[in-house]
Design a protein with these regions (language model features):
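Active-site entrance/lid segments in N-terminal catalytic domains of soluble metabolic enzymes
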Residues: 1-191, 195-208
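Conserved active-site-proximal phosphate/metal-binding subdomains
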Residues: 95, 184-190, 194-214, 219-365
């Protein structure tokens, strides 16, 4: 059996057990998602910040471009977010003193949950084959409805305990997100400080779970893929390598920072969204360090910085962008199409596994 014939590739009906990470915020546009799926991997829509109408349009565009499987990722809403007006005014004042554009907070728990419910409805109505979840457990009813409709459910976990909760909830696959991963930490079970790395997390999860495991975090080349499979993963999820792709919706300044940054330039920060996320350090993150205790919980902080991030993208100002990226940045130094990225990864894993096989045969002769 070759390396790409795994329980994950069979379950998801994909040729290679490689998942393009569902990066929210405009990166995973339909062209990128469809090109990844067309190349034999699994394209993913990061739908966390999309309205249900926008998601519906994305899904329809992807289906017009490919008949292959793809995934839609949803952010499970916070159970209860209670913030005083005084706290919001304090953070608003801090941002304004920095001459940062501030977005009026329109968030309520009710509107957040309502959009999430409508997103789920869009997934079901449009026959999306795979639905993944981040930031928490979907309801028992949501999982039941998806599975009764024949959809595959994927959970995101940062500890074995979180993964077990997802498996018990009915998830068919679990993404084990190591602390090296770019973007938001998928933590939801009071373990934000654990920061377990991919190499330590994957084998422990593989031993504890009955469902397939996807390794995520710091994987950016063929060696990382091969290592994850050896550690017990049934597949891998890569994000940062797809940000500079020609099909990616990331702003040019963001792509340039990915291609020019090093592994020691990423940090975990709450400055932009109120949740810990790994990204390339910039002026905004550094300016916010003295005000760490005033940063508001997600999604309120995320609402406040919405205009800042939008303005930075338009102005191509990387110093005020949320430049989410993982720790393997030295391995990403060339802009290619999604197909070229995947072709290189697949050929590389073929070479690595063939070389290992020859080494084993030679040592046994």
């Amino acid at each position: 059996m070759t390396w790409h014939h795994t329980s994950l590739s069979r379950l998801l009906k994909i040729e290679y057990p490689i998942v393009q990470a569902p990066m929210a915020g405009g990166i995973t546009v339909p062209k990128l998602v469809s090109e990844v799926s067309e190349a034999g991997a699994l394209g993913s829509v990061g739908a966390g910040y999309l309205t249900s109408v926008q998601l519906d349009q994305h899904i329809k565009e992807i289906k017009a471009l490919t008949s292959r499987p793809f995934n839609v990722n949803l952010f499970v809403p916070e159970k209860e977010v209670s913030i005083s007006k005084e706290d919001i005014q304090t953070m608003t004042g801090i941002l304004k003193k920095m001459n940062m554009p501030v977005h009026d907070v329109s968030f309520t728990n009710e509107t957040s949950y309502s959009n999430y419910e409508k997103q789920l409805e869009a997934v079901l109505l449009n026959d999306v084959p795979i639905c993944s979840f981040t930031f928490g457990l979907p309801s028992i009813e949501a999982v039941r409805e998806l599975k009764q409709a024949g959809r595959i459910v994927i959970g995101t976990a940062t500890t074995v305990e979180e993964a077990i909760l997802f498996e018990e909830r009915g998830a068919d696959v679990i993404v084990m997100q190591g602390s090296e991963a770019g973007g938001h930490r998928g933590t939801f079970n009071d373990s934000a400080d654990a920061c377990i790395g991919t190499m330590a997390l994957v084998p422990q999860a593989a031993d504890a779970l009955c469902v397939p495991v996807i390794a995520a975090g710091g994987i950016a080349d063929a060696r990382g893929i091969a290592a994850a499979l050896i550690l017990g993963a049934d597949g891998v999820q890569l994000g940062s390598v797809f940000i500079p792709c020609t099909e990616s919706g990331a702003p040019a300044a963001y792509k340039a920072k990915i291609l020019s940054s090093k592994e020691d330039e990423t940090v975990l920060t709450r400055a932009f969204s109120g949740k810990y996320a790994r990204g390339i350090s910039n002026d905004f993150i550094q300016k916010m360090k003295p005000f760490e205790n005033s940063i508001l919980p997600y999604p309120v902080q995320n609402e406040l910085t919405k205009r800042l991030r939008s303005h930075a993208a338009k102005e191509l100002n990387a110093e005020n962008m949320s430049l989410w990226a993982g720790q393997s940045l030295r391995l990403i130094n060339e802009s290619m199409s999604a197909k070229e990225v995947l072709d290189r990864l697949i050929a590389g894993v073929n070479d690595v596994t063939e070389s290992s096989r020859k080494d084993v045969n030679a040592s046994g002769s």
